[in-house]
UniProtKB/Swiss-Prot annotation:
Subcellular location: Cytoplasm
Ligand binding (sn-glycerol 3-phosphate): K104, G132, K186, D238, S248, R249, N250
Further details from the record: Glycerol-3-phosphate dehydrogenase (G3PDH) is generally absent in archaea, because archaea, unlike eukaryotes and eubacteria, utilize glycerol-1-phosphate instead of glycerol-3-phosphate for the biosynthesis of membrane lipids. Surprisingly, the genome of the thermophilic archaeon M.thermautotrophicus comprises a G3PDH ortholog, most likely due to horizontal gene transfer from a eubacterial organism.
EC number(s) stated in the UniProt entry for this protein: 1.1.1.94
HAMAP family recorded: NAD_Glyc3P_dehydrog
Reaction catalysed by this enzyme: sn-glycerol 3-phosphate + NAD(+) = dihydroxyacetone phosphate + NADH + H(+); sn-glycerol 3-phosphate + NADP(+) = dihydroxyacetone phosphate + NADPH + H(+)
Coiled-coil positions: none
InterPro entries reported for this sequence: 6-PGluconate_DH-like_C_sf (IPR008927), 6PGD_dom2 (IPR013328), G3P_DH_NAD-dep (IPR006168), G3P_DH_NAD-dep_C (IPR006109), G3P_DH_NAD-dep_N (IPR011128), NAD(P)-bd_dom_sf (IPR036291)
GO MF annotation list: glycerol-3-phosphate dehydrogenase (NADP+) activity; NAD binding
Protein family (similarity comment): Belongs to the NAD-dependent glycerol-3-phosphate dehydrogenase family.
Example of a GO biological process term: glycerol-3-phosphate catabolic process
Protein name: Glycerol-3-phosphate dehydrogenase [NAD(P)+]
Species whose genome carries this gene: Methanothermobacter thermautotrophicus (strain ATCC 29096 / DSM 1053 / JCM 10044 / NBRC 100330 / Delta H)
An example Gene Ontology CC term for this record: cytosol
Amino acid sequence: MMVTVIGAGSFGTAIAQVLSWNAEMVRLMARRSEVVENINRTRENSAYHPGVKLRDNIEATLMDGSVLEESEYVFMAVPSGNLRSIVRSMNSSLEDKKIVSCIKGIEHPGLKTMSSVIREETGSRTVFSISGPNFADELIRGMTSGITVGASTRYAREIAGLLKSPRIILDHSENVEGVEFCGILKNVYAVAMGILDGQITGENHRHSLLTLCFREMNLILNEMGYGELHDRFCGFGDFLLTSTTDKSRNRTLGLMLGKKMRLSEDSTITIESLRSIRAIRELTEGLELPVLEMVYQTMQEPENVNLYIREFQERISRPEF
């Protein structure tokens, strides 16, 4: 089977390497010709994974819908803010494909998951998602990783066949958007743990805050009808990894906010995090979510972070009973 990965960034390249063990050929689509030429010439994506050799059955190519003709499955790994325009540019080539979103983000305004955007633009009825606690630099090196496949059982088995490896642990949910929603939420709460890091007095404190964050995330999942996903790789696993590890871009963003460091307002991670936080806040209007509110206020007025942390600490110190 031939498979295409759209997006030759860090995760797109990593998932292409994973897929290459089971697919006959993997096409890795990039936007820039110099990236395509460099990957095919050196067998590396030196911008993201220097020193990691890509397998011989991975071929880089420019983004062009005609390249998709022979592919049964297409994995999407592009920034969430660019997804709609990229899909729109090749939608007639995607309408009969099985499409797997690897993207952790939400469209705002519009409040649509990535699979919803893909379905809307292509008309495809076979759109799925994968998510889990996966840093791309470990995934591409074959280190053990857990992935949740969001698809009906029939298609989940096909996707599992493409991902299978002694070092890939899979679980499954038929709730495609729920799997995606976990990936959106965990990013928000990873920012929270980063913001609060400077206030943590010890491990008791750290894990109490982790519990509060996960409880709040669970409350939102239940409210959205996705409560069964909290113990999947896309739920607890991804939350724990992203909230406690300094390799996490969202946790790092929170650390910078907590230290009042100047942020680049046009950086991808800042834009995507703010988009996700605003979207979740709109979707959960009416719920009492002190962690989310603290993150939202801090992102809006980072110079007042100490005030918002103090208000949050006062709120959580009041007994719930």
